[in-house]
Amino acid sequence: MRLILSLPVLAVVLAMVLEGPAPAQADPHISSSLESIPGKLKEFGSTVEEKFRTAIDHIKKSEFSEKTQNWFSELFHKVKEKFETTF
């Protein structure tokens, strides 16, 4: 008996939820919020670009990258000398 009564109540609640907000509850400034999206995306893009450039500069100037670059250069010269003496 309870299941028979709860199913119509569930159907009514589901219909109310799927109906969405009433026109009085809807955001009247939806067009202005849609117009501001390109500006926000541009601002987000410039912020990400600035942070990325800062991170890359930090990596380039770090001691680790300098040591790694020197190590690879030395290794390359050693291999090059080895080939020159062998062939």
Curated annotation (Swiss-Prot):
Residues 1-26 form the signal peptide. GO terms for cellular component: high-density lipoprotein particle; very-low-density lipoprotein particle. It comes from the Eukaryota. One of its GO terms (biological process) is negative regulation of lipid catabolic process. GO terms for molecular function: fatty acid binding; phospholipase inhibitor activity. PANTHER family: APOLIPOPROTEIN C-I. Belongs to the apolipoprotein C1 family. This is Apolipoprotein C-I. The lineage of its organism: Eukaryota, Metazoa, Chordata, Craniata, Vertebrata.
